[in-house]
Amino acid sequence: MRLTKKTVFIGIASLLILGLAAWGVNVFLVMNNAQKSFDKNFIHFQAKSDDNETFITQGIGKKEAYNLSYSPAKKTIEISKSTKNGDIYSSDSIYGAVKVYDIKQNANRYVFITAAKPIIVDFGITSVKVTYDGGHFETPYSELHFGETFPSEDN
């Protein structure tokens, strides 16, 4: 069999299409796994007493990290920002804690209907974006952590 330009072109195009398909499947699986974990560990989390459930935390080594926390017992949601200064971490609430009245889901988007303005969680191709009144933050899937419980400060 003789290799012609047409045969080589078809071979390269086939490999390119297979590579793109594999990349697309990988992106879908990462996003789908993150969304399933969010649903299991956050939306349907069953906390003991007044424990809060943290959904998004960015890498521990970062100077700033954003957290979306939920207290199933109190039905409240809060967004906080942790800042690292040397070896010391400080955390400030930047939104909440506000009462959650309902959670709406539409494909890759969750909308938390709260006593204030809604909080929107969008699962994108490479990251999760949380939008709230006054701002937003985005976390790549590689820095995303789920299901971290900690006692509420009110206990």
Predicted regions and their residues:
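Intrinsically disordered, low-complexity segments enriched in glycine/proline and serine/threonine
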Residues: 8-9, 51, 78, 108
